[in-house]
């Protein structure tokens, strides 16, 4: 290692800036990292060399000594060794420590650098919390007008004692001694070398010196949580409302999960929903159906006037514009469809009976049904 030119190892000029050194080291470290070159001793040795070279050149004092005396200033100095020919120096670090320092992973590769090396993510960072589902039943009135509901549910939250770290106050997380912070370890199966999640740290890259006495190192505890949920007008059965970050807490810096509120609308005693339209049936007196008039009908937004034309038949459907459900996606509000059912009196007073008999006598043939299509079609059955 002492005979190598440190600048050449990193591929930079002698006057390279600190940022240029760091950029060059990142590129070389990714190229020669042992995890990217399993079983390749030459790559592993080169990884150690470039790590040692970078550690020397990034330190102004060590770099000055190297520029003056060359590699001889550090003869015998390697990963974990003393400074050798340089007086007053401290020891060198493990090459993996240098790697973690540069890539800022607090004890392991993860996120962007691992994706850069292998095209995917892995352990060494926090674990995201799970998403949760809450089934919420509301009335049709609440679905039409919108509402605000308070819900209560149990979930994993960050431990109050350790603030989610899993470590007892005064203790801390340290680099996992098994995987050296990588979150994975290499295993050999005959001629095949493969990686697997570190059994010591579970892929976190760190372990806890002294677990928290409340959460026992989990970093999370189960608690009952209350949350106010705003329900927008127009929701329907199966509508999902997302409450970002209100799922279960992440572990070791991982993001919280989300909470999904799934809506269920109760059946209504009067209205039936058909998309954004509402349907209802109302009874009217046969005198109103015959003579016509105006009545008030209920809607989800109050009363509305409905004009009944003269001679309205039972089963006739009327449309009240914009009295249906609001559209969840915006746009025009639905309508309310009103089907009338003409009620025939089941009992009559003597006076009422006489009036109807007089009506039947003076009507003659005019009392026959005005719509004869059904009877014409039914003749062949008699």
From Swiss-Prot:
GO molecular function: ATP binding; heat shock protein binding; unfolded protein binding; zinc ion binding
Cross-referenced SUPFAM superfamilies: Chaperone J-domain, DnaJ/Hsp40 cysteine-rich domain, HSP40/DnaJ peptide-binding domain
Cofactor: Zn(2+)
InterPro entries: DnaJ, DnaJ_C, DnaJ_domain, DnaJ_domain_CS, HSP40/DnaJ_pept-bd, HSP_DnaJ_Cys-rich_dom, HSP_DnaJ_Cys-rich_dom_sf, J_dom_sf
CC annotations in GO: cytoplasm
Free-text function comment from the UniProt entry: Participates actively in the response to hyperosmotic and heat shock by preventing the aggregation of stress-denatured proteins and by disaggregating proteins, also in an autonomous, DnaK-independent fashion. Unfolded proteins bind initially to DnaJ; upon interaction with the DnaJ-bound protein, DnaK hydrolyzes its bound ATP, resulting in the formation of a stable complex. GrpE releases ADP from DnaK; ATP binding to DnaK triggers the release of the substrate protein, thus completing the reaction cycle.
Keywords for this protein: Chaperone, Cytoplasm, DNA replication, Metal-binding, Repeat, Stress response, Zinc, Zinc-finger
Residue intervals of the J domain: 5-70
Gene this protein is translated from: dnaJ
Chain residues that bind Zn(2+) 1: 159, 162, 212, 215
Protein name: Chaperone protein DnaJ
Binding note for cofactor: Binds 2 Zn(2+) ions per monomer.
């Amino acid at each position: 290692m002492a005979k190598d030119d440190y600048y050449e190892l990193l591929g930079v000029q002698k006057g390279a800036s600190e940022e240029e050194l760091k950029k060059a080291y990142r590129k070389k470290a990714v190229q020669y990292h042992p995890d990217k070159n399993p079983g390749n001793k030459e790559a592993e040795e080169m990884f150690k060399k470039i790590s040692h070279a970078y550690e020397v050149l990034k330190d102004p004092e060590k770099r000055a000594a190297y520029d003056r005396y060359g590699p001889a200033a550090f003869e015998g100095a390697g990963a974990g060794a003393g400074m050798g020919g340089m007086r007053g120096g401290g020891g060198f670090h493990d090459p993996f420590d240098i790697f973690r320092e540069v890539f800022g992973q607090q004890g392991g590769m993860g996120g962007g650098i691992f994706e850069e090396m292998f095209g995917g993510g892995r352990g060494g960072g926090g674990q995201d919390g799970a998403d949760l589902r809450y089934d919420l039943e509301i009335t049709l009135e609440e679905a039409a007008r919108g509402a605000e509901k308070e819900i209560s549910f149990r979930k994993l939250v960050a431990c109050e004692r350790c603030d989610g770290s899993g470590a007892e106050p005064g203790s801390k997380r340290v680099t996992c001694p098994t995987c050296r912070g990588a979150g994975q370890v290499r295993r050999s199966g005959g001629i095949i070398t493969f990686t697997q999640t570190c059994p010591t740290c579970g892929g976190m890259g760190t372990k806890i010196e002294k677990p928290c006495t409340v959460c026992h190192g989990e970093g999370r505890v189960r608690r009952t949580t209350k949350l106010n949920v705003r329900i927008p007008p127009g929701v329907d059965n199966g509508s999902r409302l997302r409450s970002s970050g209100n799922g279960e807490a992440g572990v070791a810096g991982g993001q919280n999960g989300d909470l999904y509120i799934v809506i269920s609308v109760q059946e209504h005693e009067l209205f039936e929903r058909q998309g954004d339209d509402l349907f209802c049936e109302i009874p009217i007196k046969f005198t109103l159906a015959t003579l016509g008039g105006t009545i008030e009908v209920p809607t989800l937004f109050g009363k509305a006037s409905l004009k009944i034309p003269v001679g309205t038949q039972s089963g006739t459907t009327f449309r009240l514009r914009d009295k249906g459900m609001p559209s969840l996606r915006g746009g025009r509000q639905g309508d309310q469809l009103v089907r009338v059912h003409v009620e025939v009196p089941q009992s009559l007073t003597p006076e009422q009976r006489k009036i109807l008999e007089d009506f039947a006598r003076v009507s003659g043939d005019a009392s026959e049904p005005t719509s004869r299509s059904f009877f014409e079609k039914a003749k062949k059955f008699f």
